Regions:
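Short Cys/His-rich Zn2+-coordinating modules
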Residues: 166-171, 188, 219-224
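Surface-exposed acidic, glycine/proline-enriched linker/cap segments
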Residues: 37-47, 216-229
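Conserved nucleotide- and phosphate/pyrophosphate-binding catalytic cores
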Residues: 261
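Auxiliary alpha/beta "docking" domains used to position bulky ligands
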Residues: 1-179
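Immediate flanking context of iron-sulfur cluster ligation sites
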Residues: 172-181, 224-235
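Iron-sulfur cluster-binding cysteine motifs and their immediate structural context
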Residues: 185-219, 227-258
Length: 261
């Protein structure tokens, strides 16, 4: 087996569901991100420094290969309490960052066995870059109209992470075909009318998921929408409307089954 096959086999062995590779020099969607900022859609959580956002290399590290991974999780809906409060599925149970970082470091140590003396760095919602953009470059899925990464096997209920490695691998660009086509179920489902489906962007100034993370969110409109949808932290309404998120079998990892209630 070549390096990519060995890496993919080991990733599956440690509980990673999808893996893909891309050269670190691949073209990113800088123009689209600049448009996103220009439209004022940013919530302020993202790195708005264009240079830093798309820089994988540093003074002491030269990025050569991107390895993107995804771990599926169930679209679990926490039982409502007497106030019918809900949390988004991604926030229920064990902190995924800890699990993902453990898997990524495990995979990184495997890379060092393949190429002793090489270097890698990991990220899972912690890098300057976009996990979703990297996942697209590495062929894990496509960007849905609600701006989430959608995979054919696990829908959009996947946690994303990546390893940046200083060893070059042959990794031609293999983008996954867009399967949203004329579907607009997520767009129509959004309680805040926040989805700009033509641009595949979300106006985070309106998105309920972002508003519930903002300490200044309790406007009358937001409170009314929370009362109608039940979410007090995050929001899964658009994802649950997606055909690719129906009949998922994402509940196979025992580590997601801990501390749910």
């Amino acid at each position: 087996m070549d390096f990519k096959e060995q890496i993919a086999a080991y990733a599956a062995q440690i509980g990673i569901d999808k893996i893909g590779f891309a050269q670190a020099t691949q073209t990113w969607q800088k123009d689209k991100y600049e448009e996103y900022l220009r439209l004022g859609y940013s919530c302020g959580f993202e790195n708005q420094d264009i240079v830093k956002r798309y820089a994988l290399s540093t003074d002491d590290f030269t990025a050569a290969t991107i390895i993107a991974v995804a771990i599926a999780f169930p679209p679990y809906q926490a039982p409502v309490n007497e106030y019918e409060a809900r949390f988004c599925a991604a926030s229920v149970g064990i902190d995924y960052h800890a699990v993902m970082n453990e898997k990524l470091n495990d995979l990184g140590e495997f890379l060092l066995k393949l190429v002793p003396g090489s270097q890698y760095k990991i990220a899972a919602d912690t890098g300057n870059w976009s996990d979703r953009e990297i996942a697209v470059l590495c062929g894990l899925g496509w960007i849905g109209k609600n701006s989430n990464l959608v995979t054919k096997d696990y829908g959009s209920f996947v946690y994303l992470g990546e390893i940046i490695w200083d060893v070059p691998l042959e990794a031609p660009l293999k983008l996954v075909e867009d399967h949203c086509l004329n579907c607009d179920l997520c767009v129509r489902a959004c309680p805040m009318l926040a989805i700009d489906d033509k641009r595949r962007m979300v106006d985070t100034r309106r998105c309920l998921a972002y508003k519930t993370l903002d300490k200044n969110y309790p406007t009358e409109e937001t409170i009314a929408k929370i009362a109608a949808n039940g979410y007090i932290y995050g929001c899964d309404v658009c994802q649950l409307a997606c055909p690719y998120n129906q009949w998922l079998d994402n509940d196979k990892h025992i580590f997601w089954q801990e501390n749910r209630d």
